[in-house]
From Swiss-Prot:
Organism of this sequence: Pasteurella multocida (strain Pm70)
Known catalytic reactions: a 2'-deoxyribonucleoside 5'-diphosphate + ATP = a 2'-deoxyribonucleoside 5'-triphosphate + ADP; a ribonucleoside 5'-diphosphate + ATP = a ribonucleoside 5'-triphosphate + ADP
PROSITE patterns according to UniProt: NDPK, NDPK_LIKE
Family: Belongs to the NDK family.
Gene this protein is translated from: ndk
Name recorded for this polypeptide: Nucleoside diphosphate kinase
Length: 139
C-alpha cells in the first residue's frame, strides 16, 4: 500500500481549550507522521475559500465565523492509507454519534465545534494541502 498524505486542521475550539498536544499525541500513536505544520489565524477570505463548496448552505456564515474566531493548526500527516485511517481516527462529524475513542467523541463540543477537520478523499487531500502549504514546506 502506498504512503498517502492528508490535511488535518485542529480547529479553533480545540486550540482555545489547549487540546493541541493531546490531539497530536493521538495522531502519532496511530502511526501518522507530521510532515508539515503551521499555526494560522484564518482571514474571512481564507475561510470562505477553503470551505467554498459549502457557500450555498445555510450554515456557511456560521462556519466561516467559527473558523476565524481563533487560530487553527494546519498539519500534513503521512502514512499508508492516511485519508481513510485519519477519517476513522477522528470519527463522525457529530460527536454524539462518533465511535468511542475517536477524537471527535472525546474532544468535540458539537457538530460544528468538532475539534478537527480532515480531508475526505485523496483528491480533497491534495487540494486542501496545496491550499495551506507549498511543497517546500513539507518534509
Amino acid at each position: 500500500m502506498a504512503v498517502e498524505r492528508t490535511l488535518s486542521l485542529i480547529k479553533p475550539d480545540a486550540v482555545k481549550r489547549h487540546l493541541i498536544g493531546a490531539i497530536l499525541s493521538r495522531f502519532e500513536q496511530a502511526g501518522f507522521r507530521v510532515v508539515a505544520a503551521k499555526m494560522l489565524h484564518l482571514t474571512q477570505a481564507q475561510a470562505e475559500g477553503f470551505y467554498a463548496e459549502h457557500q450555498d448552505k445555510a450554515f456557511f456564515p456560521e462556519l466561516v465565523a467559527y473558523m476565524i474566531s481563533a487560530p487553527v493548526l494546519a498539519l500534513v500527516l503521512e502514512k499508508e492509507n492516511a485519508v481513510k485511517d485519519y477519517r476513522t481516527l477522528i470519527g463522525a462529524t457529530n460527536p454524539a454519534v462518533a465511535a468511542e475513542g475517536t477524537i471527535r467523541r472525546d474532544f468535540a463540543i458539537d457538530g460544528r465545534h468538532n475539534s478537527v477537520h480532515g480531508s475526505d478523499s485523496l483528491d480533497s487531500a491534495k487540494r486542501e494541502i496545496a491550499y495551506f502549504f507549498v511543497e517546500s514546506e513539507i518534509f
